[in-house]
C-alpha cells in the first residue's frame, strides 16, 4: 500500500520525490507547502494535518518530537528516519531509500504513530 509522504527540508530532493512517485507514493515537499525553513515541529504538524508520513534525514530532532507527541497522546501518520554516515559512501542512495520503504511496507509492520529507521530496511 503506497504512502502519502512529506519530505521535510532535510529530505526535500526532486530526484528522490520523483523516484517515490514512480514507486506509487504520493509525495509533498516543504517547497510545495510554502514552508521551507520552518521549524521541525511545524513540518510534523503540517504532515499530520494533511495525513502525510514524514520522511527526514534529521533523526535526532524528530525522535524528540515523536517522544513529546507521545506524552501528549497526539497521533501522527509515522516518521521515517534516515541516518547519514560520516563516510558519505555509506549513506543511503535515493534508490536504497525507496527500496527500504518498500521493504518496510512489505513487512506489514504499522507505520502510523511509530518511528522507523530506514537504514535498517535496506
Language-model regions, residue ranges each:
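Conserved glycosyltransferase catalytic-site signature
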Residues: 40-41, 59
